[in-house]
Amino acid sequence: MRNRGIEYGIQKTNFNEVLSIAAISEHDWINLESIVPESQSVELNISCPNLDVHEDTTIFNGFDAWPTIYRKWCIVKVPPTASYSLLDKIVKLGFTQIHASNTLPTDKGGLSGAILLPHTRRIIRYLKREYDHVEVIAGGGIKEAWHAEFYKDLGADHFSIGTACFNPFKVWRTVNEINGDPSIGVHQT
């Protein structure tokens, strides 16, 4: 599903929101970096399974230019199948915020939900063991507050709720439960 493009995305994204972008071809990171304001928080999706190409876009020119002190958020959204060497590479390039994880690639697109739990758990454990300074955003199967609590106990700093969004009544109940549970310590950005 294609969107309306980067200019439209920038126009519709408030200064305190995160703009999610992906590179499709080799020079996209360079082109996007020259267009996106330096102060705009971004999430770099390096693994969108809905694209025709399934490759590691961190090898594309300009990926390493994104980390900056001017952005509050410069998140890399990794695939659930991310290798430890890919995670090492991302951190060594200067990224300190990682979203684990994207949807699981299938022949028919990306699969989300509870199937991501073991993948997200593996990524959180590795990052917190090897790079405790990295902020981890955990996602995958969060439908109830206890799912966020599970990820928090593994070391997640923030949470991404996608699965619950398929039911608008469920998502608000889940967000309110998470925000109302002081043991989880969730804050909205």
Predicted features by range, described:
Residues 10-14, 64-71, 91, 124-132, ...:
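Surface-exposed amphipathic alpha-helices with a cationic face
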Residues 15-19, 69-82, 127-139:
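Short beta-strand/loop segments at the ligand-binding rim of alpha/beta enzyme cores
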Residues 21-23, 46-48, 76-80, 102, ...:
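A cross-domain feature marking catalytic cores of carbohydrate-active enzymes
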Residues 42, 98, 159-160:
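Hydrophobic residues within beta-strands of alpha/beta enzymes
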Residues 46-59, 80, 85-134, 168-174:
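Glycine/Thr-rich beta-alpha phosphate-binding loop at enzyme active sites
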